[in-house]
């Protein structure tokens, strides 16, 4: 068994879609990034890569490479899942938290879980997604960005 943690943050800006866990969230702003800027998937990817000892998302999918510009983070997650399977690992479980003052994430949690389970080929009981605010504190509390944390157990 191996455990890895992941963290990601992106700035909220106008004229971008807000994608979390591969699901479009209805909101007036979206996250700025080289890819679709899906902070949840990026944190999950880093937790998986960390558990497998394979570096991090920036090493594997550098933002200096134009082939990743605008890419769906779910495609990156699928590639990471294939990498760990090739090394003989499978996901035991994933637990993640999305930190955002707005929008309200809880109505989307089940769709997010289904999206991630579909890509990772795991059952719904193997993933947990939570959402919280920072009670108006810090950059997420001021609505300037969204962050996410994740932990993954590989078996």
UniProtKB/Swiss-Prot annotation:
EC number: 4.6.1.12
Pathway(s) per entry: Isoprenoid biosynthesis; isopentenyl diphosphate biosynthesis via DXP pathway; isopentenyl diphosphate from 1-deoxy-D-xylulose 5-phosphate: step 4/6
Alphabetized UniProt keyword annotations: Isoprene biosynthesis, Lyase, Metal-binding
Reaction equations catalysed: 4-CDP-2-C-methyl-D-erythritol 2-phosphate = 2-C-methyl-D-erythritol 2,4-cyclic diphosphate + CMP
Enzyme class: lyase
A GO MF term: 2-C-methyl-D-erythritol 2,4-cyclodiphosphate synthase activity
PROSITE patterns, per the entry: ISPF
Coiled coil residues, start to end: none
Binding site for 4-CDP-2-C-methyl-D-erythritol 2-phosphate: 8-10, 34-35, 56-58, 61-65, 132-135, 139, 142
Gene Ontology biological process terms, A to Z: isopentenyl diphosphate biosynthetic process, methylerythritol 4-phosphate pathway; terpenoid biosynthetic process
Protein name: 2-C-methyl-D-erythritol 2,4-cyclodiphosphate synthase
């Amino acid at each position: 068994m191996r455990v890895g943690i992941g963290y990601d943050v992106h700035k909220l800006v106008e004229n971008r879609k807000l994608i979390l866990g591969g699901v479009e969230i209805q909101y007036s702003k979206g996250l700025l990034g080289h890819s679709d800027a899906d902070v949840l998937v990026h944190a999950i990817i880093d937790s998986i890569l960390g558990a497998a000892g394979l570096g991090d998302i920036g090493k594997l999918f550098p933002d200096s490479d134009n082939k990743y510009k605008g890419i769906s983070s779910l495609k990156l997650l699928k590639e990471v899942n294939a990498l760990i399977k090739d090394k003989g690992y499978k996901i035991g479980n994933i637990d993640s938290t999305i930190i955002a003052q707005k929008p309200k994430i809880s109505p989307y949690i089940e769709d997010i879980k289904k999206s991630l389970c579909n890509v990772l080929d795991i059952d719904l009981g193997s993933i947990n997604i939570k959402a919280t605010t920072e009670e108006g504190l810090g950059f997420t509390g001021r609505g300037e960005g969204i962050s996410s944390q994740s932990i993954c157990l590989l078996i």
